[in-house]
């Protein structure tokens, strides 16, 4: 059974701590309601070892699924699940992934996000890749997935439910696994990254880079914070 928590890299990024290297004058630390934009990008996804032997005449290429789950407390972006498939992936290959996975821009009435959780996972298939669009349709019609989405929508509104949110996101593996077909139980790499607004402070302006890597795969995340009044 697929377990996305195998080969797991996890980190909580506190913007209160990150703000320590941002020079400010006393009293000018602004609350989260003052930021004007936030973007999270995923890029540089590298397969270092595809765990497929090269035995003549077989070239040792792998078939891979790439799963992305983003959960936030933004009203119209509470949960976003995406799946992509990649054929004939060799050792050292870069997957064609360089995209924005979360974007928020200030409007007059919209609440600033206080937490964004990202889970990405690289999963090797043991059979021909299935139709990704059909898989996604089946997952979103799955009663367990609907129940999960409902609970996440409820918990994300309460900062005290942080651990429950983390646990719920982890359970997505059992839901996704039953729709992917025959895949390896252990992903190449799963990355769980939380970006949180601790004490209402998003004070690290500009771009912050994050990197996760093990012996099988590597990938990068970046988060960009904008504030027109401080730039």
Predicted region positions:
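N-terminal amphipathic/basic membrane-interacting segments and domains
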Residues: 1-231
């Amino acid at each position: 059974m697929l377990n996305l928590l195998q080969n797991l890299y996890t980190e909580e990024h506190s913007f209160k701590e990150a703000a320590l290297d941002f020079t400010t004058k006393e009293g000018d630390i602004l609350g989260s309601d003052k930021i004007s934009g936030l973007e999270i990008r995923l890029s540089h996804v590298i397969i270092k070892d595809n765990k497929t032997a090269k035995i003549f005449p077989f070239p040792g290429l792998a078939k891979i699924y790439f799963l992305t789950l983003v959960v936030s407390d933004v009203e119209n972006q509470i949960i976003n699940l995406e799946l992509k498939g990649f054929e004939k992936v060799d050792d050292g290959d870069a997957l064609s992934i360089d995209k924005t996975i979360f974007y928020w821009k200030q409007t007059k009435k919209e609440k600033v996000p206080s937490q964004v959780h990202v889970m990405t996972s690289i999963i090797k298939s043991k059979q021909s890749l299935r139709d990704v669009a059909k898989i996604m349709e089946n997952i979103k019609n799955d009663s367990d997935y609907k129940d999960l989405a409902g609970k996440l929508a409820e918990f994300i509104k309460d900062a005290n439910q942080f651990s429950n949110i983390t646990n719920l996101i982890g359970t997505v593996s059992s839901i996704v696994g039953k729709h992917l077909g025959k895949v390896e139980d252990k992903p190449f790499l799963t990355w769980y990254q939380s970006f949180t607004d601790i004490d209402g402070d998003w004070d690290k302006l500009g771009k912050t880079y994050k990197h996760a890597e093990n012996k099988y795969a590597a990938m990068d995340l970046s988060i960009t914070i904008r504030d027109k009044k401080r730039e």
